[in-house]
Amino acid sequence: MNKKQKKMLKRIIVASILFIMIKVAKLPEYIEIPLFLVAYLEIGYDILLKAFKGISNRQVFDENFLMAVATVGAIGLKSFDEATAVMLFYQIGEWFQSYAVGKSRKNITELMDIRPDYANVEDEDGNLEQVDPDEVEIGTIIVVKPGEKVAIDGIVVEGSSTLNTAALTGESLPREVSENDKVISGCINMTGLLKIKTTKEFGESTVSKILDLVENASSKKSRSEAFISRFARIYTPVVCYSALALFLLPPVFNLIISNPADFGTWLYRALTFLVISCPCALVISIPLSFFAGIGGASNQGVLVKGSNYLEALASCKYVVFDKTGTMTQGVFEVAGIHHATIPEEKLLEYAAMAESYSTHPISKSLLKAYGNTIDKSRIENVEEISGHGVKAVIDGVQVLAGNDKLMKMYNIPYQECHSVGTIVHMAIDGKYAGHIVISDMLKPHAKEAIEALKKAGIKQTVMLTGDVKSVADKVASELHIDKVYSELLPQDKVNKVEELLSLKQPKENLAFVGDGINDAPVLSRADIGIAMGALGSDAAIEAADIVLMDDDPLKISKAIKIAKKCIHIVYENIYFAIGIKLVCLILGAIGIANMWLAIFADVGVMIIAVLNAIRALNVKNL
């Protein structure tokens, strides 16, 4: 609890004790009335001040005005206990609402804790100086001790350590880093001392982008929130005028037909009507439900840019994936060596050496599979043949490594390969020596992710890729994806998403999931753009509506389940609050409901709705 909540709780306790003592003591009226007024002012003075300020600023119709009119009117009718009770229970409801917001804000606050307070910079004498991260320029060497946060994105130039990325990803799995590895701000250094050369200013670093995203999330309202805001602006004046009509019209009608006017009875009913009609339960609980949903999601590494996107995700029926980096790891690995005429280890060594001067991902995968240091003194006359492969002399032997076009260029008969992937054919001194199959590996939970989406109510899954048909079909088959479109250029992907959008029903939404690097146009075009694996990707954070901070595709279904739970709670609160209020308004108008039932219809319903809204935080086991 913050200071304001503690102060309000003390006021509630003092007023409650005083109220109970007065009710139990059965004091004379001349003592009881002043004590009730003391209790009333102790608990309600701020509401009266807000109502007065609202009238002064010509912003009359709000819940403070309703409470002030209802309770002052009750005092005028000498219902001092009811006036005090209405104000007391209203403040209890407000305290619950404040506490609930604080509880849901806690997850956001924990995320805000990723913001570093300082960066360690060495001065000319080699001493460490703590400076504001905003003052650190690009290219500065910062020092991160064990237990400290990485202040700014950069590259490790000295040291090795383990980083805790839990605040960013929602996962506790640590990440090992050493020299030349990229690191991002917001991670916590767990073990060794690191020296990092900054590659960005603090304002452009990952942690700043994320904090900006979360801080602005509440400004993008859902349709439900926008409706409730419009509803409250119209509803509050309507019920005020209705209460005035309830107070004036029946007595006037009674006078016309020569019956007693009974103004006191109808004033009491009108005041009861006002208390019942207070729209707090809706106005408070619906934004709180979305706020709690966004807070719970952020705690799981799912960053939602606004409640409108959370609402849209709940109606998602189609999920379209990019392949590379989304459903596959985007890291090529040697999957097999076939038809080798020399030992496989030797063939792999020749391939790695021939490709050692290239920066192509295929070359990197061969070097990784070989695993040893390349002795470049053994390599001569390296020639890269564009679109074909590489020719080199290794230990005095001519080596060819490339595709079938390279083999045809040198008239070397080769073996066809039926495996799916990139095929690197090898020839030694003009004779075919076998081929190496290199494949992009599926992500560990990719298949489970598709199954989870089906269970979450997704009607169709689609994969778009620029890869060849054979590779795309194999991946789609392994993952049980419903449709696959291959050999697409970036613009083709946008066109295909537009085509899919035209086929869906108006109330259904389509989400596109990409790695956020080359997918910005498609992420923007879909109803909901989801970027995954966005740790360190500025493009993803900018282009997407929802950002998954790690590479686990299972988070997609989790995000959908969070959205559905949040919307379910919103509608529960709408139906419950409106239903109870309508019944109580009718009972109040015909004189059956008294002020105590009005208190339940207002404060009781608000507390129940607020407690229900807090459930949107509990998303860990979804």
Q: Which residues does each predicted region cover?
A:
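P-type ATPase nucleotide-binding
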Residues: 334-460, 469, 481-497
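Conserved catalytic phosphorylation-site environment of P-type ATPases
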Residues: 66-68, 168, 268, 278-354, ...
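Actuator/coupling domain of P-type ATPases
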Residues: 19-122, 135-142, 149, 160, ...
